[in-house]
Amino acid sequence: MVRLREIPRTATFAWSPGAASPLIATGTRAGAVDVDFSNETCLELWDLGLSNDDASQELQPIAKIGTDSGFNDLAWTDSQDNSRGVIAGALENGSLDLWDADKLINGSSDAIISRMTKHSGAIKALQFNPKHSNLLATGGAKGELYISDLNNIANPYRLGSTAARADDIECLDWNKKVAHILVTGSSAGFVTVWDVKTKKESLTLNNMGRKAVSAVAWDPEKPTKLITSTPLESDPLIYVWDLRNSHAPERTLKGHESGVLSLSWCPQDPDLLLSSGKDNRTICWNPQSGQAYGEFPVVTNWTFQTRWNPHNPNFFATASFDGRISIQTIQNTRTDTAQAIADQNQSLDGEDFFAKAQTQPQVSNFSLPKAPKWLERPSSATFGFGGRVVSVGLIEKGKRASRIKITPFEVDEAVAKSTETFETALKEGDLRSICETRASQAASEEEKADWKVIEALISGNPRKGLIEYLGFQDQADEAADKLAKLGLDKEDVNGDTLTESRGSGAKKHKRLQSMFDANPEADSFLSDLAASKGAKTNNPFHIFTGSESEAEQGITRALLLGNFEKALDVALKEDRMSDAFVIAICGGQKCIEKAQEHYFSKQTGGPNYTRLLASIVGKNLWDVVYNADLSNWKEVMAALCTFADDKEFADLCEALGDRLGEQIRSTDDKALRKDASFCFLAGSKLEKVVAMWIEELRENEQKGIETAADDTSFSIHVRALQGLIEKVTIFRQATNFQDTERTKEADWKLAMLYDKYIEYADVVATHGRLQVAQKYLDLVPEKHPEAEIARNRIKLAMRQAAPQRTQSTVPAARTTLNRPLPQINAYPPQPTFSSPAPPAPQNPYAPPTAAPSQPANPYAPPAAAPSQPSNPYAPPTAAAAIPQPQVNNPYAPIGGGGYTPAGYQPPQAPAYGVQSLGGGSVPPPPRASNQSPAVTTYTTATNLPAWNDLPEGFTKPPTSRRGTPATAAAAISSPFPNQSPTFSQGPPPPGMPPTQRAPSVPPPPKGTVPPPRVTSPPTGFTPASNLSAPPPAANPYASLPQSPPIGSTMGIPAPASIPRGPSPYNAAPTMPPPSNRYAPSPAVQAASPQLATRAAVPPPPPAAASPYAPQPAAQPPVASSYAPSTPPPSQLPMQQGPPQGPPSRPGTASSQRKAAPAPPKYPPGDRSHIPADAMPIFEILSADMQRVKTRAPSSFKAQVDDAERRLNILFDHLNNEDLLRPNTIADMAELARAIQARDYETAKTIHIDIMTNRTDECGNWMVGVKRLISMSRATP
């Protein structure tokens, strides 16, 4: 519950009737004394400024006017003649004043409307009729009750006669359903219902002994129900009445500790009632059931008026005599306020604490168990993820029972249908039909071309398909026709083999040799050169005729020797190209390439086909791509499809597409976009073509919106998006596209496509296709931030309930000892010992309860079960050195430790902070009441926490009505009067804390007298080993140590208690508390003669120090039927002489108290003196603590804050350079660095080592370190 604004006035108030920004009118309370003892009385108007987030500035009145007297009541109503309504004031001098609110705000001098003095005494209450705002009822002294009409204010009429009523009317209220019914309450206890129509009494309630009535209120919905309250401190009661039975109240509400002064029934919800009174409290009730929901912050003086806002019931105001009117809300919007004030009180000490507590209002926090009625909805619906709609509707009208219904929902059914069709076709592998269908349905030529190209890529020979798409298959047929007209057969041109012509002996030539002169004479000449073996001709020739040129002779000699390269060089030098090519054919590939290169170098000015041929022959198609005119891009593309190497094909296509893209940008010719898209598709360059497709998507979407008649913009956008995703999907399958950037974290080439994938996944998920959405999200890189969120959302939506494991239980112990329940005995038992007993379970009276293993939940409160994962936000459950299968309480005080006789098998060391047996702690008694105390027996439950435990989800106890925070009371050793504590088993071994605690007992009931405060520690035998033990530092967080009282007939001398740290509020005790908390402390009686004759028992060694609490007083063992009875260890020194007699009279606290520890060098919170070697500890741990605080669940705020406070103790030690030795500081620095590196195992190992081997340095701060390790591990 949050206090939104405060008005610094002791005044009665009224809310403005308008629904706009709320205003409050205040009138100086009659009889109240201001802080400056001023007697000025006035009417003021205040603008609360609730729309302003800054609530730190003090409010100032927006209008003010002086009055002749103080106010007992104020009312504000709507008026047709006054824009802001009329304010009516009930003055102490009997005057009824009316003001125009609008004129007051504007500062007009004639703001007062009228002043009527019909009442002979003070007007105590007034109210406007809720149905007829012109009717005003006023009641006051001597039973005077008037009804005034604002239209005729000078002539009110009176209800009742003077003789009938002589007591004062303290309160009144109009019926909310029947306009002419009015109820009044008087100081004499009369609750009278009036019928204003007949001007007579209707009935009078039998008000339980005629107790004075301070407030009345009608039920806002039921016209026969009303509530009354009494201002008596002896009977602070609220009565719920039903007029159908006026002899007795229907229900009585009890919760106030002093008289009730004001009631306010919420007009919008009859289940909400506010009451305030003399106990400084404002309580919220359910008057229908009598349940008290909770109380609002307690102030420091009477709360005499509380009112709901009439139009916005989220707000209400409460006026008190501490000089404030508090405007609050029932919503928990700032739950950290309570903790902030509690922390502030925690840091105060001594006089500062009590001085602050007198003026500091207390805070409280509670939540309504059900939503207020104005927030309830008879039906509601919301869209859920995954194409679902969740709707809630009432099963039956008038009953608080709803039916939840989840139904599928599709924004656009066409989207879902097309998605299913496409995914089905993909599964069947029928990609060609998809392309054909999409091409036929394409809305533009560009889109149609894209689908045609993709269809070509799907074919068995993609390059041939692309050539056919470009139209060059038809051109090849046309060229063949032209060759046929020249007398050449198509087969002759394209065939790989040459066939002999009939009759002529001529041979056909290959296509690439068509550049040479192809004539019959040349063919005949060549054929004649090849003769068969031994063939003779009639044409003899000479190798050398003598007429040859020198070049011809050189060629001939080279040929004779088979040196074709030299012959080729000579032929090329002489520019005999025909001879050179023939020689090159004989010389092999190297000679051919050399001849071709020479030829093309000579043809620079020749036909264009020679350059193309040069690029083809030289396998350098980059020249064609970069230099060919873009008007012939199709021809270039055809050449690439025909001759390009597979390794270069994609890059060549991309380069050609880039050239087309540059021309698009320079000329803004959108027609070329289709051509560039073709090139990128042919080269499988998805990142390039996607950018164009997305641009087309926007254009097509805009055109669709402009031309669509019935479609919505969402449907148009989704269809365009779906078309893009389909094209990309088919293209990726057709080209076997592999995304190599999925492992990158940023700078993706396909970033635009990834965004579309995420958008499309969201669309299909909205239509309930979660599998499809996940499929496309898996195509997005793992490190993409939006995709990661979307993937997690999909996985959560698709996650099915995991099969329930069969929970196995831990088998109970095979042998269970029969243990009798402890009996209350008025005499302490004699200390006897028996044989050692096996280790007992956690509860000595019942077998252990098996608990199923549960998964670790870092935010759930721990259950008391063995072998359970720890909760990083809950109190520590076991010691770091030796884990224990039990949940321990870090806040419980350490009980006294005894000694172990020889032969006793000690149990395992428990967690630090476990309370020992005997002397279970009980809380300080609550407020006094008339109830008598009752004795409560022990319980056999094993998982009940002690009263001083810190439970998960605990709530703070109600504070005193003076608003002073309670301090820790002195520990009570036994909850039963005249009863010594009874031990249930033998004492623990020396140096080791006990493993069990005594069963918890409930706090004592309220008593009329508080218990006496013990002011000195107990006296007794002091072992030499304890004389020099230094007192531990005061722990502001742990409970005070406690010990059971020593039996009066016990012969064993009581060991001296180790001195505990001083309390900031009370002196150290000098004696153990008495067994009867209502009796003075008795002196220890003389030792029993029977026990005095026995051998003296050696004193027990001091108990091990606990890092959680100050060292408690050591306790001797007492008789137990379960304790071992072996002789004491021989190595322990035996006591010499008889036991000590009774101690002397306790001295003063100052004389008995040990020397207090030296004050720290520097004040708490100072961090300027931390040494350099310890500074990493402070910096790392404090930074990680802040990270945990910002992310930990709010339900664990108390545990987080406690861990932070304990860390501050460590930082104070580091700042003062005390307690921690250099090697411990070095280890803590290593631990901090391990936490920073999230190496929690190393941090835990270091923590265990320090806890185990350096316990003298482990104060209260070590618990904070352990908690931080667990919390940091669980906090993302």
Curated annotation (Swiss-Prot):
It is found in: Cytoplasmic vesicle, COPII-coated vesicle membrane; Endoplasmic reticulum membrane. Coiled coil: none annotated. Residues 865-885, 957-985, 1016-1028, 1079-1096 have a biased composition (Low complexity). Residues 928-945 have a biased composition (Polar residues). Residues 820-885, 906-1171 are annotated as: Disordered. Keywords: Cytoplasmic vesicle, Endoplasmic reticulum, ER-Golgi transport, Membrane, Protein transport, Repeat, Transport, WD repeat. Its main location: membrane. The keyword Magnesium does not apply. This is Protein transport protein sec31. It comes from Aspergillus clavatus (strain ATCC 1007 / CBS 513.65 / DSM 816 / NCTC 3887 / NRRL 1 / QM 1276 / 107).
